[in-house]
Amino acid sequence: MLDDRARMEATKKEKVEQILAEFQLQEEDLKKVMSRMQKEMDRGLKLETHQEASVKMLPTYVRSTPEGSEVGDFLSLDLGGTNFRVMLVKVGEGEAGQWSVKTKHQMYSIPEDAMTGTAEMLFDYISECISDFLDKHQMKHKKLPLGFTFSFPVRHEDIDKGILLNWTKGFKASGAEGNNIVGLLRDAIKRRGDFEMDVVAMVNDTVATMISCYYEDRQCEVGMIVGTGCNACYMEEMQNVELVEGDEGRMCVNTEWGAFGNSGELDEFLLEYDRMVDESSVNPGQQLYEKIIGGKYMGELVRLVLLKLVEENLLFHGEASEQLRTRGAFETRFVSQVESDSGDRRQILNILSTLGLRPSVADCDIVRRACESVSTRAAHMCSAGLAGVINRMRESRSEDVMRITVGVDGSVYKLHPSFKERFHASVRRLTPNCEITFIESEEGSGRGAALVSAVACKKACMLGQ
């Protein structure tokens, strides 16, 4: 009898592993993804192929990295997900001539109707938050330079002018796509009329992260975010940036690699769960690479895998609760919590019981394996992108061994218990002639935007504007 039960358990385990095996990517797969990513990056940089390239490689007009001599008070805004942050950044000389960057900030959550209403509603809400923040800090009377971290695909015409190409990450505010975002912000501030601001720079969160980390480590020339979405930027040789005139020096390029796969480059790796997540998203067929990696989708992928295991009678006695059948019910933070479980399964039990389930010990272990499969694939898929960027940089600089630092931010990278380790190990396997240091950015987006503003202000002063 016991033998039968043990045999049944073993068979069940085998079937579960068979289903989860689809998530495993071999090194050859990752090399394939990496070389396709590099090809698309190349197409994005070239004038004649830029238009149809899935990876847009957008020039940011951030050319110089800050030198540590810009001082003053800056306001910084950060819009990139469901939370919006306003930050006051004091940039100055610390003790012993050291550089100091001090910050105060406040988070505001963005109501659904502002995310999906009109651009005017969204930017009016943003200027209301700024007004509230300035009141709290008695700063209404000051006209501060403002740096705006805006984490969506933007075609820059200058450091303070950029056209929104398309919304991502669940935003849908009408009347913003195709328009200058800085202009929309300036208009909203003017409409409000109770404070003045000088918007000097708009940057992507990857750029802000890179600049922020550059202060810690002067070899930081790549910025990456793995949070709600996933994206990276890096310093590219100007001669390769065909969309901007001039061949001297380097410019930071925002890859917008989340859109990789839009032209079918990932089709052979997409599973039924990926297709279901994509079909029920606000932007079907777009941002496919990001949908494999980003925190906005990870929990939902796990939920769909769990439902598949229930259907196959391998989990929860073949019965799913109403909650488990509800889209979005398995949150991405649950994935981190399940994988952080110490082994007594208490954390896993708690999460599953809030979803109306009464799991056995074996069920808990299967749920953990499902989470590990989805998050490990995300880490490996992400590593192929970064390895593509770093190998490209090494080749274009003709260095035998390249030392480089990558500044990273984002909730998945920072909060998931094993993402980092799996990701680092995989990147290093794919970049044999590179010595890579990873550093986490602290308050990266806000601080980085303020530092970019500081550079912009300094340049404006030098140009006598």
Swiss-Prot record:
It is an enzyme of class 2 (transferase). Substrate binds at S151, F152, T168, K169, N204, D205, N231, E256, E290. CDD domains: ASKHA_NBD_HK4_meta. It comes from the Eukaryota. GO terms for molecular function: ATP binding; D-glucose binding; fructokinase activity; glucokinase activity; hexokinase activity; mannokinase activity. Keywords: Allosteric enzyme, ATP-binding, Cytoplasm, Glycolysis, Kinase, Mitochondrion, Nucleotide-binding, Nucleus, Transferase. Gene3D superfamilies: 3.30.420.40, 3.40.367.20. Subject to allosteric regulation. Low glucose and high fructose-6-phosphate triggers association with the inhibitor GCKR followed by sequestration in the nucleus. SUPFAM superfamilies: Actin-like ATPase domain (SSF53067). Residues 10-454 form the Hexokinase domain. GO terms for cellular component: cytosol; mitochondrion; nucleus. ATP binds at residues 78-83, 228, 295-296, 332-336, 411-415. It is found in: Cytoplasm; Nucleus; Mitochondrion. Its EC number is 2.7.1.1. It catalyses: a D-hexose + ATP = a D-hexose 6-phosphate + ADP + H(+); D-fructose + ATP = D-fructose 6-phosphate + ADP + H(+); D-glucose + ATP = D-glucose 6-phosphate + ADP + H(+); D-mannose + ATP = D-mannose 6-phosphate + ADP + H(+). Pathway: Carbohydrate metabolism; hexose metabolism; Carbohydrate degradation; glycolysis; D-glyceraldehyde 3-phosphate and glycerone phosphate from D-glucose: step 1/4. Residues 204-443 are annotated as: Hexokinase large subdomain. Induction: Up-regulated by endocannabinoid anandamide/AEA. Belongs to the hexokinase family. Monomer. Interacts with MIDN; the interaction occurs preferentially at low glucose levels and results in inhibition of hexokinase activity. Interacts with GCKR; leading to sequestration in the nucleus. Catalyzes the phosphorylation of hexose, such as D-glucose, D-fructose and D-mannose, to hexose 6-phosphate (D-glucose 6-phosphate, D-fructose 6-phosphate and D-mannose 6-phosphate, respectively). Compared to other hexokinases, has a weak affinity for D-glucose, and is effective only when glucose is abundant. Mainly expressed in pancreatic beta cells and the liver and constitutes a rate-limiting step in glucose metabolism in these tissues. This is Hexokinase-4. It comes from Mus musculus (Mouse).
